[in-house]
Amino acid sequence: MTERLQKVTGIVLKETTLNENDKIVQVLSKELGVIKIYAKGAMRLKNKFHSSIGIFTYSDFVVYKPANSDLYQLNEASVKHIFHGLSENIDFLSLAMYMSELTVEVTVPNDKNNDILRLFLNTLHIMTSKRWNVDMCKAAFEMRLMADIGFMPNIVGCCHCGRYEAETFYFIISKGEMYCQNCFHTAAELPQDVIKLKMPSVMALRYFILADMEQMFSFDLAKPYQLPVFKICEEYVLKQTGRFYNTLNFFKD
């Protein structure tokens, strides 16, 4: 073998079966971003790589890339962590599938982004440990992911006067902008995609985007304030990426 072996650590986002023996997996890796790995023989139950490259398995991979190929070839693999709770709850699994599809859509192949990998792993951990409900996990992932790829909305204060706190704010999905109750009618022309927010909802959005990764899942939001947050996070993703996701339909059903 003349190609250089390289060790990467990451989680399997997607798998494509080629035949009864082989498959291709897409891995969100710490070192190379999202890459495609060809795993020869991995479909066989007795294959040494079978458990290491299962969907949503976090593993160490030793790979090499042949010249003039978009695929990495798998040389070795070992499991670091399996999120067993995903297979026990259809809501958990369907959210993980949506997170995977969204991540593949917005990341650039072979472009390293450790923050996205940390976000993905932390969200799965919080969800499977049942520390947050699945809808809160979804909203946090969506908004933090948009911020990590450069589409952070302006939720620090009113876009017109800079006000940090108000009884009511208005968030405009298409613009990613927020206005206080005093400025909204003068600074905007009452667009259709506007959502009214109270301060607890605003603080939740700020936490999703601005808090340290270890702290962004560490607060409680009362149910009356959750729905506007869920709506903003989902619709903002759809607006910024310009498409819908089949896995989102599956999650919502």
Spans of model-derived segments:
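Non-catalytic alpha-helical scaffolds and adjoining flexible linkers that form interface surfaces
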Residues: 1-24, 28-253
